[in-house]
Regions:
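Beta-propeller folds
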Residues: 3-316
Length: 316
């Protein structure tokens, strides 16, 4: 009954919505006129848009502050969420790692212990909650080198898709200094302990929030060198233009597998022989009619999973 009464009270809260002014913008598509009265909001860097966002936020939080059961709801959610959460362990070199959240931490913390020792001896390896006091820097992806002695991890500042990649010596936990910037929609895949492959777009001119980015590229970064010297591996030509490209090195360091797509479904597959880097990249699959990925390699044979002509994916 109390919840119903509180819900009724929240519905009684009056909201004075701010007015969003309209402009006379009209585009014509195939002979049809389409009005776009809020085109001005597409300029996310303008003073007008900034003022509009501030006004909208003020309206929202003014309303939320008056919801009678807000604190009660917050306390209930905190109680439900406040329990220890531990991820599956994984082994790298001499250590076993796992992700853990004590209950209400904003981000999971990476712990580790010497493999073979009691897991209760685990200590903090990397705590994203300490990246910045206000919590606006988060941990993205992580990738250990083949030996397990090096780590590349990405961070996001303020929720941006444009990330930095940081490299670390996992034995000493010291940052190596090979920090890459302006990396977007990328994993990291190590080649031996010498460097790693990653993907990104050219940094757009103007706003990074609204500018178009549609040509993903794969680069190789060699440790100890400048990002300016990174080698463009794939995606630099019009024929190689794709919206999303990912690359990973096989476990034996012999091949680089490249997956390229123009949307969020369907991908092409390519392979590069890392033992003969001068050789051209070979096409495995030249269409995007299916989702096809390499799942294993034994000797010279690749095993793929695909949904091509297979509603339930098959291994080929």
């Amino acid at each position: 009954m109390a919840c119903n009464k509180n819900a009724e009270k929240s519905r009684d809260i009056r909201v004075e919505y701010p007015i969003s002014h309209q402009v006379d913008t009209v585009d014509e598509y195939f002979g049809t006129a389409v009005k776009d009265p809020y085109r001005w909001l597409e300029d996310d860097r303008s003073k007008e848009t900034e003022a509009w966002v501030e006004t909208q936020n003020k309206t929202t939080f003014d309303y939320l502050s008056k919801v009678p059961y807000r604190e009660e709801l917050k306390e209930r959610l905190e109680k439900l969420w406040n329990y220890e959460k531990i991820g599956s362990p994984f082994k790298e070199a001499d250590y076993t790692y796992f992700y853990k959240n004590n209950g209400l931490q904003n981000q999971y913390v990476i712990y580790r212990y010497k493999t073979g020792e009691d897991p209760s001896t685990a200590s903090i390896f990397l705590d994203p909650n300490t990246f910045k006091e206000d919590g606006t820097i988060s941990l993205g992806g992580t990738s250990f080198s083949k030996s397990g002695n090096l780590l590349a991890y990405s961070i996001s500042e303020g929720g941006s898709d444009w990330r930095k990649i940081i490299t670390m010596d996992v034995v000493t936990k010291n940052i190596i200094g090979d920090t890459l910037v302006d990396v977007k929609f990328s994993g990291m895949s190590w080649y031996k302990d010498e460097g790693f492959y990653y993907s990104s777009y050219d940094r757009p001119k103007g706003s990074v929030l609204s500018a178009k980015t549609d040509q993903h590229k794969v680069y190789y970064h060699k440790l100890g060198t400048s990002q300016d010297d990174d080698i463009l591996v794939f995606g630099g030509t019009q024929s190689e233009k794709h919206r999303y490209i990912g690359a990973r090195v096989t476990e034996d360091n012999r091949f680089l597998i490249i997956s390229a797509s123009v949307s969020t479904s369907g991908n092409k597959l390519f392979i590069k022989n890392l033992d003969a880097p001068q050789n051209p990249i070979v096409t495995i699959l030249d269409h995007t009619k299916s989702d096809t990925y390499v799942i294993a390699k034994f000797g010279d044979r690749l095993y793929l999973v695909t949904n091509l002509n297979a509603p339930y994916p098959k291994i080929v």
